[in-house]
Amino acid sequence: MDMEVDEAISGTSSSRLAPIEEVKPTPKQIKRIAAHSHVKGLGIDTETQEAHYEAAGFVGQAPARTAASIVVDMIRLKCMAGRAVLIAGPPATGKTAIALAMSQELGDGVPFVPLVASEVFSNEVKKTEVLMRSFRRAIGLRVKETKDVYEGEVTELSPVEASDNSGMGKTISHLVLSLKTAKGSKQLKLDPSIYDSILKQRVEVGDVIYIEANSGIVKRVGRCDVYASEFDLEADEFVPMPKGDVRKSKDIVQNVSLHDLDIANARPQGRQGDVSNIVSQLMTPKKTEVTDRLRSEINKVVNEYIESGVAELMPGVLFIDEVHMLDVECFTYLYRALESPMAPVVVFATNRGTTTVRGLGDKAPHGIPPEMLDRLMIIPTMKYNEEDIRKILVHRTEAENVQFEEKAFDLLSKVGAEKSLRYALQLIAPARLCAQTCGREVIEVEDVDRCTKLFMDRGESLKKAEEEMRQPKNKK
């Protein structure tokens, strides 16, 4: 009967032409050009282990980049945990870019948590709590487990209904699921709670999934490559049909931070019994504080997993920019946090010289108490010269896909050398808009000159403010 219906449908479709519909192309994703989009790494020579003058989007600051590469190597060898580094130098000398390049050199496997010192201060959460959260975000845990799973291509997915005694109609009593591999197939009778997870992941016949035998967690791997020739508007990942038996032992590796474990255990849900269940309980972080007692219990469990070989600790990097904004209470807390057994590498950055320590009143180098300075490895950065600024501007114009006339680019480089590099970088986008307004794609001298007159730099703004202060006020 079904075959007859299919033939009838195919017959009618051949006699009538389907209407032609225009397929609209998917909108091109706009890639945002950030301040350090051109930085791709530290630019270190693999043979000499020294930084190239110009490499990986970086120009100059070779000694600082070489020192940062040594810190990266120490982090990889896990002999840097609990130590701190300070990147100190004038404004616009590449301090944040060096920290970003360090994270790119470390890769995705090592946690990298950026934090601005002003983010520590909040009316809802204590300063020490914000620092502790950041510390635990920067400490990763790689969990390795061998689990009993059912894996294969879905060939049957049938929920079985049964009458409800409460008179509310029919409910799903169990789920019949058939999985197929290259070696054989198996039919499973599953709990109805698993059906909800299957619906959420939109599992259908032809998908490759695996189900953990202990916890019942369902994971959709992808679409079986047998259906790769089918026309589908949605881009899907095609995977080969699993080999071996349907029921097998599988090694599962999951990366999670200590902060994720804190949040997952603050309001535990689901079944207990193994690490993956704890990882699966991750939810949206709350603004309330996690108790020290809970953290100590999690640390005990983590230490047990590490000793038994189930998990591996991955100390990451916590980058705190504008560290001079921290007060003496934060620094006092950092003394103890850096000495704890579970501590990441902390990288500070500041552009201040000798300034007042907040909450203390005394002046100190970089606004950091002397007790903390003794614990730091300090990496200095130097001011860029005119040639460095010119090459940095070349990298930025290439990243932003902007074309300059040679004389206009000379003027922009001169502005960067005389005023500031950041001011010159900020003039690129307005100059392009001025050129486009005049119907040109190439930026000329008049475009750069117009932008310098429309937008003041820091020095001109300060000079104008001082002149206004000296002018006598008109009495009413």
Curated annotation (Swiss-Prot):
Tissue: Expressed in gonadal cells.
Alphabetical list of Pfam families matching this protein: TIP49 (PF06068), TIP49_C (PF17856)
GO biological process, alphabetically ordered: box C/D snoRNP assembly; chromatin remodeling; DNA repair; nematode larval development; positive regulation of translation; regulation of transcription by RNA polymerase II; TOR signaling
EC nos: 3.6.4.12
Keywords on record: ATP-binding, Chromatin regulator, Cytoplasm, DNA damage, DNA repair, Helicase, Hydrolase, Nucleotide-binding, Nucleus, Transcription, Transcription regulation
Protein name according to UniProt: RuvB-like 1
Subunit-level organization: Forms homohexameric rings. May form a dodecamer with ruvb-2 made of two stacked hexameric rings.
Keyword Cytoplasm: yes
SUPFAM superfamilies named among the record's database cross-references: P-loop containing nucleoside triphosphate hydrolases (SSF52540)
